[in-house]
């Protein structure tokens, strides 16, 4: 009986409100060197970005702008950009990527590229030379299975779930995956995406239905979603940016106007 009384007293003294407090940043936390525009993806927030659009929709142009234009990301990654692209040596739009990071460009996907990136980042963290990184996967979903149980492209799928741990907190880090068809992207990568960029060139009904099924509920339902898609389709080379890392989701048109 005495033990029961002690237990009851213990609960009587418990606080009325329980708060989940944020964990303090580690001592080696790096303060961001560049302040990003609030309407664009922020690599200092650890981004996994999906870029969806058909051929000649401006995917490569958009990515080149993010990687090179000072008003966007500029050169925040320095030499630490790895590119896997079937067309890197034949695409005029991507030539600046090839010139800047030619030693880290690969025409064919192989798990070893990801394994080597992981090893490199682990070593940089140990020696204090870590400055963050960017991994660009350009139209290579034929090398990565959309089936979460498949071993095809498994290294990069697994990497996409924990990539943020391979750099010191506060450094810029991003994975960019561009593809022509949304459903060809690994389910795991779709679920973990922090941002989705949809081209106005996406007109195929099945493709639009796939995107609506995935994201309409995040923006208040199908009516809102279709209104935003129509706004995006008013002009060529337009982009709808869904910031999935926020709750509720934020939606921007051409990184200029907030729609939701």
PLM region descriptions:
Residues 79-80, 132, 236-239:
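Short, surface-exposed beta-edge/turn micro-motifs
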Residues 2-4, 87-88, 242-248:
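Short, flexible beta-strand-to-coil junctions
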Residues 187-260:
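Conserved GTP-binding G-domain of TRAFAC-class P-loop NTPases and closely related GTPase folds
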Residues 22-43:
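Pre-Walker A adenine-sensing motif
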Residues 82, 174-176, 240:
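A structural signal for isolated positions on well-ordered beta-strands in alpha/beta enzyme cores
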Residues 1-27:
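Charged, amphipathic alpha-helical linker segments immediately N-terminal to NTP-binding catalytic cores
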Residues 74-84:
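Conserved catalytic segments around the Walker B and adjacent sensor/switch elements
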Residues 37, 47-69, 73, 86-90, ...:
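Conserved P-loop NTPase motor cores
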